[in-house]
Amino acid sequence: MNEQTVLTLRQWRALRGYSQSKLSEMTGVTERTIINYEKDVTNLHNAKYSTVEKLAIALDVKVSNIFLGVNSEKPNYINK
């Protein structure tokens, strides 16, 4: 079966080896905001597009991947 692993913002960050603090430094998004996005995806869904775009660029993923769709493009090595 070819199931894709669905990743959260926290998982993308961990996959890249970034702490919340490091991602904050890279994006200009406060660490508290990143914590809130990781804690409750509703907060992320209510974020400004420009904020989500900064996170996506830093994580080297498409903006759509930040919103966790099963059909989102994932790196091949995490597809199962």
Model-found features: residue ranges?
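Residues within the helices of the helix-turn-helix
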Residues: 10, 21, 53
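Short coil turns linking two alpha-helices in DNA-binding domains
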Residues: 19, 30-33, 48, 62
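Recognition helix of helix-turn-helix/homeodomain-like DNA-binding domains
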Residues: 29-45
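Short, charged recognition helix plus adjacent turn
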Residues: 57, 65-80
